[in-house]
Amino acid sequence: MVNSFIKTTEEKMKKSVEKIAEELKHLRTGRATPAVLEEIKIDYYGVPTPVLQVAQVTTEERQLVIKPWERNLLNVIEKAILASDLGLTPVNDGTVVRINFPTPTTEQRQKWVKKAKEIVEEGKVAVRNIRRDILKDIKDKKKAGEISEDDEKRLEKEIQNLTDKYVAELDKLFEKKEKEIMEF
């Protein structure tokens, strides 16, 4: 039972960190990267399909070039990008859709860093909430006589170590994203 607390805590904290890492991946950095299109879906023969599955996406300089497998998808892809809340402006030249990424201003970059910080803080709160819930469960089990006081203290220490580990991991994710945003 003692090890199950640690295993459960680690699994939950790891999932929280992975979720935050995924959110950070989708945060704009001003770079032309196909990852910005991952969430954009089009209606492909009645099935919502990601743009990345119906077109070849390449990066050239400061732009993405989207070349659909079927030419009739050009307008559909263009409209889907315009409808997304990414603030991108696609240009359809009849054979490909191009998306230009202008050099971001310092103000835009600072805004993106601030957003990254908010996302990471949400992750830290989630990790700490997991710690709080598990520690409450441990105290309840001790009161019920299911675990000893020594086990309780050892678990509290191990749970705190896990919390510190995953909070540090979130800090590293933020530093990496901040560097990526501010580097140009």
From Swiss-Prot:
An example Gene Ontology biological process: translational termination
Q: Which GO terms describe its cellular component?
A: cytoplasm
Which positions carry the signal peptide feature in this UniProt record? Answer: none
Q: Which CDD domains match?
A: RRF (cd00520)
Q: Which UniProt keywords apply?
A: Cytoplasm, Protein biosynthesis
- A GO molecular-function annotation: ribosomal large subunit binding
Cellular compartments annotated? Cytoplasm
Q: Which NCBIfam families match?
A: frr
Q: What does this protein do?
A: Responsible for the release of ribosomes from messenger RNA at the termination of protein biosynthesis. May increase the efficiency of translation by recycling ribosomes from one round of translation to another.
Q: Which family does it belong to?
A: Belongs to the RRF family.
- Provide the protein name: Ribosome-recycling factor
Q: What is the lineage of its organism?
A: Bacteria, Thermotogati, Thermotogota, Thermotogae, Thermotogales
